[in-house]
Amino acid sequence: MTDGRQQHTRRAPTTDIYDATELTRAFEQLMRTKRFNSLQEQSRSRSRTQSPSHAQPYHTPPHPSRAPPPPPTGAHYPSSQSPSQQHQQHQLPASSSLRNLPVFPSPPRDQQSLKFRNLLHVLSVTPTKYENPGLLDEALSLIPLDRLYSEAEEESQIMQAQAASVGGKPEWGYQDCVIRALLRWFKNSFFQFVNNPPCSRCLMPTIAQGMTPPTPDETARGATRVELYRCSESTCGSYERFPRYSDVWQLLQSRRGRVGEWANCFSMFCRALGGRVRWVWNSEDYVWTEVYSEHQRRWVHVDACEGAWDQPRLYTEGWGRKLSYCIAFSIDGATDVTRRYVRSPVKHGAPRNRVPEEVLVWIIHEIRKKRRESMSKTDQRRLMKEDEREEKELRAYMASALAAEINNLIPREQTSGRPGEQKTPASMQDTPVDWVAAQQMGPGQSGPDRSQDGR
């Protein structure tokens, strides 16, 4: 028996009994089966209580998606469902928020869902403004192209040499290096972060006085709101206005602002250099940029305000923020990219209660259809394959996080080695602070949490 226990101990590191991948697959299959059975039970309950004369037709998703057809869109059935069924139906959106389970697109009907739909449609217009040829020409005239291309060429050659020495592939391509050079120049030389603007008369610090209506000239320049500040010097007492411009033309002139202005202007610069750009909106009042890497065939997180490149876990694991919705908008449509930035919904996810998940999927498909309806069939198929590839990537993040959680629940046995020697749990080996420190490289250093400053 002793030999058997010792032999089992030696095999523990390589045993397949607690294979995290298999546990993840089994858990996901269990949840899919549970949801499918629940939907079948709801369907049978409705068919028994609903008269055929009152049945309503099916609604087909507006986007020619690969999703299954949606369920019947009838009214609510409070009298035909037991309290337990109603509670189960209420809990379904929460269990499907990971988006690894089937979600049937459903159009918004209640006032709150319609309001959120209108908000996303308004936000989706932002990246379309970057397609103005005159704006792009003006941006190119301000960018030191020779300097950026030289830096990108040098960095690209270094990466190629490093990859050749180990027989691998360079981490980033030349176009990625161009955007990285742009990021460094934009943060260090072009744009200025403003908290309280200094007094224009005596250059002393100012004190916030609240909001004030924009002047006609400020409105014409795209200012949606204006902050008012008073000079802290008693002998001066002058007031300073800080218009919050959303027009990129004006940002090229002012070259200052907070996170919102930084992300808006930098995204346009990326577009001017020929990059595919996303403007990412976060419901916790923060924004950033994503650029598409043809080299890695994926979207890359870029935060110009922080000088951060490909650090999607910065906000949650780095700053300890809780995020609910992260929606990326581009000229090709919209995508819910929350799973890229919230790897552990339990630890870092805020409640997603603005709309049901199936309504959010419907809105995303609606925006995509609107942006792509004038495209050629070839481009539509290309984007659809790209959507599928990204969906696979986002699901992998959730599967990995789930596997890690399951793995942490498994009791750790002492492995063969020195008596009393124990390995450090995986959850303690890489803390958020260590991870952020390791990611502070390349374009710049990640600074303090600016999300409290607002957009």
Swiss-Prot record:
Alphabetic keyword roster: Metal-binding, Zinc
Binding-site residues, Zn(2+): C199, C202, C231, C236
GO BP annotations, alphabetical order: glycoprotein catabolic process
Region feature Disordered, mapped onto this chain: 1-110, 408-455
InterPro entries in the record: Papain-like_cys_pep_sf, PNGase, Transglutaminase-like
Keyword NAD attached: no
Pfam families hit by this protein: Transglut_core (PF01841)
Gene Ontology molecular function, alphabetical: metal ion binding; peptide-N4-(N-acetyl-beta-glucosaminyl)asparagine amidase activity
Low complexity biased stretches: 38-53, 74-98
Cellular-component GO terms for this entry: cytosol; nucleus
Pro residues composition bias: residue spans: 59-73
Sequence similarity: Belongs to the transglutaminase-like superfamily. PNGase family.
PANTHER family: PEPTIDE N-GLYCANASE PNGASE -RELATED, PEPTIDE-N(4)-(N-ACETYL-BETA-GLUCOSAMINYL)ASPARAGINE AMIDASE
Name assigned to this protein: Protein png1
Gene from which the chain derives: png1
